[in-house]
């Protein structure tokens, strides 16, 4: 990720989008990030300016590029760059893996796939009146264009009940067996139904709920420790480890200007 940057970050279940701009005092050489890896698929968009991604002996500087899960890489960038992160265990994430990473861990992505969405995102990012909901809408659309049509059935009342229950109990231990009891299903049956209707395994979905909760609390000004406890992490170190594994940065780096 990039230091010396300002920007906006939005999260939704199974994905997130980070739009970052180089600080005004950054020169033509841009900001150089440190080499790192993370478990989420990363798709990088040059909204204005430029970037270059490096992974091993590969180097990509196209308008849009993607990095496979757990691939060590570094970025140098200037201008405004967007990162869309997708959970690789999700239905959409698995579709992206099949589509992009059959031969290489760092790939260019055809800009025609996204139409006007990158320009829409840049305009929305520059408009201080644009809501978080609008940014999430654009982020979801970008992820959807990348994964292609992923069939998710209409909402199941039992799954909706489990999601509401899990969201209300994030500060406690959440077990599949307890969730199954809420749904009135066996654990094995809930596991199958949950993936079918959300695109994410139950355990992964709960982890993203916890990350969303922690980010929300931290953005309100809570300490990292308080945010971690409210979201059901053991402590701030546990939250930071989880965050770094998923996105390649510590949770404390969310406090960008």
Which residue ranges define each predicted feature?
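Short hydrophobic/aromatic patch on the recognition helix
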Residues: 190, 194, 238-239, 243
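Short, Lys/Arg-enriched, Trp-marked, Pro/Gly-tolerant hinge/linker segments that flank
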Residues: 104-115, 122-186, 196-204, 208
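Conserved active-site tyrosine of GNAT-family acetyltransferases
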Residues: 67, 233, 239, 243
């Amino acid at each position: 990720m990039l230091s010396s940057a300002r920007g906006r970050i939005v999260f939704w279940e199974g994905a997130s989008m980070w739009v970052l701009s180089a600080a005004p005092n950054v020169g033509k050489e841009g900001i150089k990030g440190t080499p790192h890896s993370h478990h989420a698929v990363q798709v990088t968009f040059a909204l204005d300016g430029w970037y270059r991604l490096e992974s091993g002996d590969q180097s990509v500087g196209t308008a849009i590029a993607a990095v496979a899960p757990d691939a060590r890489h570094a970025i140098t960038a200037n201008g405004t760059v967007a990162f869309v992160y997708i959970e690789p265990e999700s239905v959409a994430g698995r579709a992206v893996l099949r589509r992009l990473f059959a031969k290489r861990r760092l790939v260019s992505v055809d800009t025609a796939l996204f139409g006007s969405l990158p320009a829409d995102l840049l305009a929305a990012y520059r408009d201080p009146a644009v809501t978080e909901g609008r940014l999430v809408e654009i982020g979801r659309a970008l992820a959807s264009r990348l994964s292609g049509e992923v069939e998710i059935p209409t909402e199941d009342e039992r799954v909706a009940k489990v999601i509401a229950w899990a969201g209300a109990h994030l500060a406690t231990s959440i077990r599949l067996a307890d969730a199954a009891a809420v749904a009135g299903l066996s654990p094995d049956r809930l596991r199958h139904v949950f993936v079918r209707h959300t695109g994410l395994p139950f355990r992964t979905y709960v982890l993203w709920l916890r990350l969303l909760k922690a980010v929300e609390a931290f953005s309100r000004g809570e300490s990292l420790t308080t945010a971690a406890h409210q979201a059901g992490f053991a402590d701030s170190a546990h939250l930071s480890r989880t965050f770094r594994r998923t996105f390649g940065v510590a949770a404390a780096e969310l406090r960008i200007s």
